[in-house]
Structures are given as structure tokens and as C-alpha cells.
């Protein structure tokens, strides 16, 4: 499954999640069989070219998320996690909060 995370850079180890309007890059995480398969970085979400993305993980619950839900994505929010590795570990153990209407 594919997961978007708005981040402050394009380094898989050092990039940190940021509010979507502060994102310098968008990390696209390919998560399958309980682990991260790959992480690719894009300048904008549109650069992916319309491929289906299952989840988006946002920095806080006050961000605009309705457009993502309209696109069919599940929207999750981090609690304390900042790095991609920590976020994906929390995702794996269902420790992220879900946003819903």
C-alpha cells in the first residue's frame, strides 16, 4: 500500500513530518507485508501522476483533510512521532489516530 507523508526534506533517515503547507517534499512510502519496502520523494503530490494512494499521514488534526478523503484516502494523524521511521513503526502497530467525519 502507498502512504503520503508531508516532510521537510528528501532524506529518508533525517526528514521530519511537517504541516502539509510547509512541506518541502512529499514522502511516498510503499508499505507491504509489515515493513517499508521503499520511500520515494516528490516535490508535490501531483508529481505521482494519479496513482492510487491508500493513506495520508498528517502532522496534526487541524489540517485540511477533506480533499484527501474525497480522493478515497484514509487520513491518519501522528501523536508524537516525527521521523518517517517512527511514523511507520507507529502505523505498523496501529498507534496513529484516524480522522473521520
Model feature map: region roles:
Residues 1-52, 79, 83-101:
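Non-catalytic interface/targeting segments
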Amino acid at each position: 500500500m502507498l502512504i503520503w507523508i508531508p516532510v521537510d526534506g528528501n532524506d529518508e533517515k533525517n526528514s521530519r513530518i511537517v504541516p502539509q503547507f510547509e512541506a518541502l517534499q512529499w514522502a511516498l512510502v510503499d508499505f507491504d507485508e509489515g515493513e517499508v519496502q521503499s520511500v520515494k520523494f516528490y516535490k508535490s503530490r501531483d508529481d505521482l501522476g494519479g496513482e492510487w494512494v491508500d493513506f495520508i499521514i498528517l502532522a496534526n488534526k487541524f489540517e485540511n483533510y477533506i480533499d484527501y478523503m474525497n480522493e478515497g484516502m484514509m487520513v491518519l494523524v501522528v501523536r508524537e512521532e516525527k521521523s518517517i521511521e517512527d511514523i511507520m513503526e507507529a502505523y505498523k502497530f496501529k498507534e496513529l489516530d484516524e480522522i473521520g467525519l
